[in-house]
């Protein structure tokens, strides 16, 4: 599934995983440039304050599959 970062970049979720060190749930995702990133699941699906607005850090671009 693809998501748009609040700063404008588009990313595709590769998978969700568990961090070995402390069992934190993480999201593995890839940018359009091919760079792979890992972020705690709570942060990936969390919100950010931008000016007076609270926005999702990553907003879904693709409709949910049924």
Label each residue range with its predicted role.
Residues 1-66:
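Mixed-charge, low-complexity intrinsically disordered regions
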């Amino acid at each position: 599934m693809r998501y748009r970062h609040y700063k404008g970049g588009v990313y595709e979720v590769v998978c969700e995983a568990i961090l070995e060190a402390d069992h934190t749930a993480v999201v593995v995702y890839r940018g359009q440039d091919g760079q792979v990133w890992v972020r705690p699941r709570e942060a990936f699906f969390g919100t950010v304050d931008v000016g007076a607005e609270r926005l999702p850090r990553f907003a879904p671009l693709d409709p949910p599959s049924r």
